[in-house]
Every structure is written in structure tokens, then in C-alpha cells.
A protein has these predicted regions:
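Serine-hydrolase catalytic core recognition
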Residues: 4, 9-307
Length: 307
């Protein structure tokens, strides 16, 4: 159903979509390096505090950003894009991260293996382990913050958001690492759902994509190897509300990936919704603000009453 904002919004029925032209383009924006350590991180917004901590000496760092002088607040764990990716400027006032903070959410940002700017070894550690180390690092960072910072984080209201590659990771976490419902709701934004067919849902050379995720160029071997890192394999385990958002003109991951996720979950009577909006694989679309508001509204409706 198309609404007044120009969004195609799911209405509890299966969605049928025709694939026309598969293509792929990568989104780049301005990025900023962040000094890491057990200390406050500098920022120019006096209403916001951000700090980072090393987790158990493993090399994993988590960044926490929130409004100053607030009581315990709900949190959104951010799965960054990539898979190999620099850190965005989380305090860029036009960013989705800044929007979340201003809406009263704390951000928990695991600088998982694959994030650049920490060291070459850390940056390359994810290669050959997509869908494995990124999931492990996200869970480890989340549990660390929930355990050590429950004085400022409302641990009963922790949510999960990921865009692009991060959208793929959150879908995997939904089925493989959320049996305890640590995440009360999840948003996958332009993510991959079925890794087995993803090589043909992007403009990249299929053999290169198969090599990256399955270390093979044989279709049958690839399909078998990626089963354990494909969100589709674990859809029956989804146990919290999930919102899929996808841009109709996305050329990195075909919109049909999110449509398939929604349809499969719907058949299993999962609590799932789908929102499709015009635009390519970037946050910078005409309806950016409306999309951000939709995500926040979704998380707000999923909050548990902790009074």
C-alpha cells in the first residue's frame, strides 16, 4: 500500500516484485577518525557525551554515545556497513546516528573486526569470516555495555539497527544470537537476506562475490557453504519484531532481498513489516528524514514498560 509519504508499506500480505536490472554501486560519504581508549571522546556538541572502552583485552572496542545528564535511556546497537568499512562521523547532524541520539536513544557501536582505522590486522581479520566474527563482536560489545553500564542504559529496551552490510548482520543475529531477546526489536535497512542468491542480486561479478563469502566459484558448493551465514537459514528463529526497509533503486542489494525476507517471515507468522521507498543505496534520499522518523517510531512502539 502506498501512503501519503510515498512509502510502499506492507499490510500483512505477500509482496510480489519483479527483478529487472541487477546492478551495484557503493555509497561513500565523508568519514571522521575517532581516537579510541578508555576515555571520553571529544565532540563539539555540549549536550552529548561519547566514550569508548576496550573489551576484555581482545582488541574489540565499543563506542557509546548519549545525551548528557539523562536518566537511564533506551539504546540502539549499531551494526556498521562494510564489510570492510571506515567509521562514519557519528555526530554529523545530518546522519541517522545523530537523529537517534537527539530522539533520546543511546548508541552502542561495536567497532567490530573489519572496521578500518584501528589497525591493518583488525581490518583484515573479518576476511573469510563474514557472518561470524561480526556477529560475535556485536554480541560481545552489547553484553559488555549492558553489564557494565546499566546505570545509564535501560537494558530492557535495547534495539538493533544495521544498514547495508550491517542490515545483513542484524538479520543473521535475529536468527542465530537473539534467543534471549537481548534485542527487543530489529531494523534491517537495505540488507542482504539470502546470501546464496546474493551474487546474482548485485552488479558485481558473481564469481568474486561467491569467492568472498564461500571461497569457491562453484554454485552448488557455494550454496552449501554459505548456509550457516545466511539470515534466510534461521528465519524460523526470529522472535522479536523486525522492520525491513529497502530503497527501490538500490543497486548494491536488490530490493527483492528484503521482500523475500518479509514474505518468508510472514508465512511463519512472524512479527515483521516492510517499508519500500524511492532512492538508491544511500541515506541521502529526498525522504531521508521521514525514513529516520519511521525507524524511531518503530522502536518506540516496541519499548517495554519498565516503570
Amino acid at each position: 500500500v502506498k501512503d501519503g509519504n510515498g512509502f510502499w508499506r506492507s499490510c500483512g500480505k505477500e509482496v510480489v516484485l519483479e527483478q529487472k536490472v541487477p546492478c551495484r554501486v557503493f555509497y561513500k560519504k565523508s568519514w571522521a577518525d575517532v581516537e579510541l581508549g578508555r576515555k571520553l571522546l571529544p565532540n563539539q556538541d555540549e549536550e552529548i557525551v561519547q566514550f569508548s572502552e576496550n573489551i576484555n583485552g581482545s582488541g574489540l572496542v565499543v563506542v557509546v554515545i548519549m545525551k548528557k545528564n539523562t536518566a537511564t535511556c533506551p539504546a540502539i546497537v549499531i551494526c556498521l556497513g562494510g564489510p570492510i568499512a571506515p567509521m562514519p562521523d557519528f555526530l554529523d547532524q545530518s546522519s541517522i546516528y545523530y537523529h537517534f541520539i537527539k530522539q533520546g536513544f543511546a548508541l552502542i557501536i561495536p567497532l567490530r573486526r573489519g572496521v578500518s582505522g584501528i589497525g591493518k590486522e583488525w581490518e583484515r581479520a573479518l576476511e573469510g569470516h563474514y557472518g561470524e566474527y561480526d556477529v560475535e563482536d556485536t554480541i560481545a560489545a552489547t553484553d559488555f555495555v549492558m553489564l557494565h553500564h546499566s546505570d545509564v542504559i535501560d537494558t530492557k529496551n535495547v534495539f538493533l539497527y544495521g544498514g547495508s552490510y550491517g542490515g545483513y548482520v542484524v538479520g543473521l543475529i535475529a536468527g542465530k544470537a537473539n534467543s534471549n531477546k537481548r534485542f527487543k526489536a530489529i531494523v534491517s535497512h537495505c540488507g542482504v537476506y539470502d546470501i546464496a542468491i546474493y551474487p546474482w542480486h548485485c552488479q558485481g561479478i558473481p564469481e568474486e562475490t561467491m569467492k568472498a563469502y564461500g571461497n569457491t566459484t562453484d554454485k552448488s558448493v557455494y550454496s552449501e557453504r554459505v548456509k550457516d551465514i545466511s539470515p534466510k537459514t534461521f528465519v524460523s528463529n526470529w522472535n522479536v519484531p523486525i522492520l525491513f526497509i529497502h530503497h527501490l533503486n538500490d543497486t548494491t542489494t536488490w530490493v527483492g532481498q528484503s521482500v523475500a525476507a518479509y514474505n518468508d517471515a510472514l508465512k511463519l507468522r512472524k512479527d515483521v513489516a516492510l517499508l519500500i521507498v524511492h532512492g538508491p543505496h544511500t541515506y541521502d534520499i529526498p525522504q531521508k528524514k521521514s525514513v529516520f522518523l519511521e525507524i524511531v517510531a518503530f522502536f518506540e512502539t516496541c519499548k517495554l514498560n519498565t516503570i
